[in-house]
């Protein structure tokens, strides 16, 4: 008996020594992965017990995944670990860690997520007795369903997680599940359900989270969702108090005296869940601030915050290039592209569209490109439209409409298509698209900004039919919606069009009353398209009132805006990235070569000057 014990002790000593050596080689600078793997491989020569064997296979799989490109070997080790661990009792950490890592590997290597989901479903089923693992696996599985746009399934899993956390008395974890579910419901546009969940979660955060640091983290998550909820509805004014609160909360969390995430969440296993680390939350708050600034019509602010956020992203990428940082970067670039176009910097916009394309193409399996392809087509459509390539713009918007499942993006693209049909005098196509938009959005609650835009396009349509009374009716509706929520760009576009309506019916006093605030707002934004249009109206108004000096000033301004746009147009068509206007399917082309000279396609000065029938700008 003593000989057996001695042999077992000796074998244990070998295991411990080999594991210690393996860890030593792994943590060396630089890591000696080959020797680390050799030490772990040597363990198998001792015919170790099942639990040791399974744990070693798991470690081998993790090391091969983290430090090598030998994914097939990693998969073999992880599958062996799972086959050994699955039937074993009291072996939860290795069993469920293996399932989690193996699911990640399947996601990285497989064409579909089917195998990863099946693996996690089995692990969820086996883990019901272990709240920590059950909740962790539920979160992982719901994330995959959400990425696959299977939102109902993701929502159901998160509801199960909230119940499990509640049964275990894990209040912090329950709130995380509630807020995660609210986020999914927001994507599904289930407005009332989102509000109910946010109210429930908000009350728990206020009254039932004793740890002040955890409370602040949950508050940031809650406020991000609340801000996104209001912004999705175009409620730029309503959101201001929540946004201010969010900005104060993130400053609190980023303060030097704030404890580390490990100190806040490391004490209790059921509190070891963090939505996003604070450095990523910091970027996210910048992102929603950029979104708010852009919607409110503060382009300079949006640019300033974008630059800060992109700098922060690059710092974080140097530490560890997490996939979510690429997502943040693409969304920021999408926002700033629209700001550039409003300001008339279209050459910079196409460069930034190309930068967004590069970020998407750098992500494996084109997963980011698949999610953002429709948005990229929409941005290229806006760019094509602003550079008077209307055929390209139309095709880009149609691709966007066909690719996207997001109702707001579809509405946005359709409104711009309507403006193209107006500009190109395609009345039948215009009627068809306006009827379709009207039917689709009558029974649903869309963004106030987009619905205001819909009324604006109808006003524009009425103006071009010389139905001035009808145009005024639509534009007053637009102004009512825009003023209610401080949508400055929509306000300035509506005012300048209304001014043109009054000019057309000979009411110069009302025309002046509209164009003056339009120009003031446009210079604040700044919106070069409204300034160009407004300066043409002012020139006509001053000529009518025989005010030669003011007429001369307005004309000088008009020429300045026009020349700026023409100079920018010239740069655009000489840019290598201009070739993106011809991308309609598959992967976008790489456009970093020599500039393609298409000078023959530069519009003449008159094409950019707002004579009657041409001064529409884009609706973005």
From Swiss-Prot:
Biological process (GO), any one: chromosome segregation
Keywords associated with the record: Cell cycle, Cell division, Chromosome partition, Mitosis, Nucleus, Repeat, TPR repeat
GO CC annotation terms, alphabetical: chromatin; nucleoplasm; nucleus; SMC loading complex
Keyword Glycosyltransferase included in the entry's annotation: no
Domain of life of the organism encoding this protein: Eukaryota
Subcellular location: Nucleus, Nucleoplasm
Main location: nucleus
KW Cell cycle (keyword) present: yes
InterPro entries: MAU2 (IPR019440), TPR-like_helical_dom_sf (IPR011990)
TPR repeats: 452-485, 492-525
Family stated for the protein in its record: Belongs to the SCC4/mau-2 family.
Record text on subunit structure and interactions: Interacts with Nipped-B to form the cohesin loading complex.
Reported function: Required for association of the cohesin complex with chromatin during interphase. Plays a role in sister chromatid cohesion and normal progression through prometaphase.
Protein name (Swiss-Prot/TrEMBL): MAU2 chromatid cohesion factor homolog
Species of the source: Drosophila persimilis
């Amino acid at each position: 008996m003593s000989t057996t014990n001695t042999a077992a002790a000796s074998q244990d000593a070998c295991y411990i020594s080999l594991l210690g050596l393996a860890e030593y080689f792994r943590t060396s600078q630089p890591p000696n992965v080959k020797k680390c793997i050799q030490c772990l491989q040597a363990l198998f020569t001792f015919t170790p017990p099942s639990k040791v064997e399974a744990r070693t296979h798991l470690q081998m799989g993790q090391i091969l995944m983290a430090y090598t490109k030998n994914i097939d070997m990693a998969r073999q080790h992880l599958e062996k670990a799972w086959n050994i661990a699955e039937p074993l009792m009291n072996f939860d950490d290795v069993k469920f860690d293996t399932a989690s890592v193996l699911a990640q590997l399947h996601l990285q290597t497989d064409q579909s997520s089917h195998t990863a989901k099946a693996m996690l479903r089995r692990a969820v089923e086996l883990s019901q007795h272990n709240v920590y693992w059950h909740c962790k696996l539920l979160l992982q599985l719901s994330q995959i369903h959400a990425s696959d746009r299977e939102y109902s399934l993701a929502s159901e899993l998160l509801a199960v997680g909230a119940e499990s956390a509640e049964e275990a008395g894990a209040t912090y974890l329950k709130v995380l599940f509630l807020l995660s579910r609210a986020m999914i419901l927001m994507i599904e546009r289930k407005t009332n359900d989102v509000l109910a969940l946010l109210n429930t979660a908000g009350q728990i955060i206020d009254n039932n989270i004793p740890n002040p640091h955890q409370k602040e983290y949950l508050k940031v998550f809650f406020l991000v969702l609340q801000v996104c909820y209001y912004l999705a509805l175009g409620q730029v004014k309503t959101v201001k108090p929540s946004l201010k609160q969010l900005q104060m909360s993130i400053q609190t969390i980023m303060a030097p005296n704030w404890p580390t995430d490990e100190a806040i969440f490391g004490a209790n296993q059921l509190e070891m869940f963090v939505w996003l680390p604070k450095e990523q939350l910091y970027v996210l708050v910048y992102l929603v601030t950029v979104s708010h600034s852009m919607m409110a019509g503060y382009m300079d602010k949006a640019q300033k915050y974008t630059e800060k956020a992109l700098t922060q992203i690059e710092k974080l990428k140097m530490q560890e290039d997490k996939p979510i940082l690429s997502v943040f970067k693409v969304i920021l670039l999408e926002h700033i592209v629209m700001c550039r176009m409003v300001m008339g910097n279209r050459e910079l916009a196409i460069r930034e569209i190309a930068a967004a394309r590069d970020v998407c193409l750098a992500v494996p399996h084109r997963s980011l490109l698949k999610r953002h392809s429709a948005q990229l087509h929409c941005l290229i459509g806006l760019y094509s439209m602003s550079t008077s390539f209307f055929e390209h713009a139309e095709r880009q918007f149609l691709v966007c409409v066909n690719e996207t499942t997001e109702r707001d993006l579809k509405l946005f693209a359709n409104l711009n298509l309507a403006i193209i049909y107006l500009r190109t005098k395609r009345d039948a196509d215009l009627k068809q698209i306006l009827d379709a938009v009207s039917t689709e959005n009558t029974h649903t609650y869309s963004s106030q900004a987009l619905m205001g835009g819909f009324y604006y396009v109808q006003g524009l349509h009425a103006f071009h039919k010389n139905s001035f009374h009808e145009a005024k009716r639509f534009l007053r509706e637009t102004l009512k919606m825009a003023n209610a929520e401080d949508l400055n760009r929509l306000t300035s576009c509506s005012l300048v069009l209304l001014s043109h309506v009054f000019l057309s019916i000979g009411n110069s006093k009302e025309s002046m009353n509209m164009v003056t605030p339009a120009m003031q707002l446009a210079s604040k934004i700044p919106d070069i398209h409204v300034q160009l249009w407004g300066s043409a109206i002012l020139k006509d108004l001053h000529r009518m009132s025989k005010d030669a000096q003011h007429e001369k000033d307005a004309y000088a301004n008009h020429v300045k805006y026009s020349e700026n746009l023409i100079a920018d147009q010239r740069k655009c068509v000489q840019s290598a990235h201009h070739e993106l206007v011809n991308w309609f399917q598959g992967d976008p082309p790489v456009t970093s070569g020599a500039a393609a000279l298409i000078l023959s396609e530069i519009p003449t000065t008159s094409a950019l000057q707002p004579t009657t029938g041409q001064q529409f700008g884009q609706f973005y």
